[in-house]
Amino acid sequence: LNPVKSKVILLDPGHCKKHIGARGNGLKEEDVNLDIGKACRNYLNKYSDVTVYMTRTNSKCVKKLKLGDCLTARNHLAKRLSADSLVSFHINWDPEKKRSGAMILAAYNSGYNKYVSTTTQALGSSIMANLQELGIKSEGFWFRTLHDEKYKNGAKADYYSIVREGVLNKIPSLIIEHGYVSNKS
C-alpha cells in the first residue's frame, strides 16, 4: 500500500451462518474468519490514513441472498465504498491432515485489468511476507480460471467470484487462506 495516500480497505470475513465454510477440529471456518477480520480491523484502525470497513461483524450474511449473489454483493459494497482493496479471509481444509500454510488467491495477469492483477499480487506478497514473519508457512499464490467465462478481451475469467468481480469492478480483491482447519496445529 502506498503510505502517502489515504486508503479505504474492505475486510471480508468469508462465509457466514447461512453460507457455512470448512469444519475441522471443532472449528467453524466462518467463526475463525470473523475473528481474523476483527483482529485485522483493530490493527489497521491504528493508522490515521486507513479507513477500514467490514462486510460483516457478526455471524449474519451480508444480505439475504444465495451464495453467488452474496459474493457479488461484497464486491459491490467495495465499489460503493470506493475501496482501494477488498481482502477476503478464509481457512482451508484438506484430506491430508498434516497440510499447513497460508495461500493467496489472486487475479492472474489476463491482460484485461493489469492494474488489478499487479496490485493484488503485490498486496498478496506483502501480506504473505507478514504471515511468514509470524511463522506461518507459505503455500504461495493460487491462480485459477473458469473454462466457460471470459473477460471482454477474450481471456479466461478468474474462477473465484471475489477475485473476478474485483477485476471487473477495478478493485484489487484477493482471498487469503490462513491455514487448515483439518490440521490440529
Q: Where are the predicted features?
A:
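Active-site-proximal helix/loop segments of hydrolytic enzymes
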Residues: 34-185
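Glycine- and acidic-residue-enriched helix-capping/strand-helix junction motifs
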Residues: 21-35
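Conserved beta-strand elements of the Class I
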Residues: 9-10, 174
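Non-catalytic propeptide/linker segments at domain boundaries
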Residues: 1-7
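Glycine-rich N-terminal loop/short-helix segment of MobA-like nucleotidyltransferase
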Residues: 12-25, 183
